[in-house]
């Protein structure tokens, strides 16, 4: 923004100089030298005598340079007019008013840029602080220990559930074997009792 502001300042000075020259040409008087102290009168120096051809040549060169400078200044002002947020009556603006509005607009843009930079730095510091807090929380031994205990508890609960299922299956197998074994023993004892009674009855008949 600084080079643009310096260019605007140069354009302001050039516009003021041109307007002053135009007013002087209209009224037909010359202005005082601006750099002398008050009370001193600017004295005109007599130009040295030159040949008429050289005088005309120098004047034509000066006019050509002045024409180029005015054309360049006009192009710059037109580009500035296109970039400025002007209103509806932008055609009424003079060169000086346009340059003043451009300077005010540049100052506003610089203020907005500074505010954006401050906000960016604030957000960056906040992000760094949150990142540090996250790293501290991840690096705490208590957090790691809690995570390890949680994993161990999940593993132990899985093993206990598997053991309970296997114990239940063993218990069912034992109960079935006990039931089947009892029935077999009862059948064997019953058949043995019947054979014993048959033997006693046979002996009695004999």
From Swiss-Prot:
PROSITE patterns hit by this protein: BHLH
Gene: Mxd3
Tissues expressing the protein: Expressed only in the proliferating areas of the testis and thymus.
GO cellular component: RNA polymerase II transcription regulator complex
Name of this chain's protein: Max dimerization protein 3
Basic and acidic residues compositional bias, start-end: 143-153
Lineage: superkingdom: Eukaryota
InterPro entries membership: bHLH_dom, HLH_DNA-bd_sf
Keywords: DNA-binding, Nucleus, Repressor, Transcription, Transcription regulation
Location of region: Disordered: 29-66, 122-171
Complex and partners: Efficient DNA binding requires dimerization with another bHLH protein. Binds DNA as a heterodimer with MAX. Interacts with SIN3A AND SIN3B. Interacts with RNF17.
Localization per record: Nucleus
UniProt cross-references to PANTHER family, sorted A to Z: MAX DIMERIZATION PROTEIN 3 (PTHR11969:SF6), MAX DIMERIZATION, MAD (PTHR11969)
């Amino acid at each position: 923004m600084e080079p643009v502001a310096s260019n605007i300042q140069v354009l302001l000075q050039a516009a003021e100089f041109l307007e002053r020259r135009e007013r002087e040409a209209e009224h037909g008087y010359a202005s005082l030298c601006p750099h002398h102290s008050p009370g001193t009168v600017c004295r005109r120096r007599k130009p040295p005598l030159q040949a008429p051809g050289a005088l005309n040549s120098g004047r034509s060169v000066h006019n050509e340079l002045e024409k180029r400078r005015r054309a360049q200044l006009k192009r710059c002002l037109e580009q500035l007019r296109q970039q400025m947020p002007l209103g509806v009556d932008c055609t009424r603006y003079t060169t000086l008013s346009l340059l003043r509005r451009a300077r005010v607009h540049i100052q506003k843009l610089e203020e907005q840029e500074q505010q954006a930079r401050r906000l960016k730095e604030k957000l960056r510091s906040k992000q760094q602080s949150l990142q540090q807090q996250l790293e501290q929380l991840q690096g705490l031994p208590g957090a790691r220990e809690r995570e390890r205990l949680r994993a161990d508890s999940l593993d132990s609960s899985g093993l206990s559930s598997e053991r309970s299922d296997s114990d239940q299956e063993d218990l069912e197998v034992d109960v079935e074997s006990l039931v089947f074994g009892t029935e077999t023993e009862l059948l064997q004892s019953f058949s043995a009792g019947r054979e014993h009674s048959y033997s006693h009855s046979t002996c009695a008949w004999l």
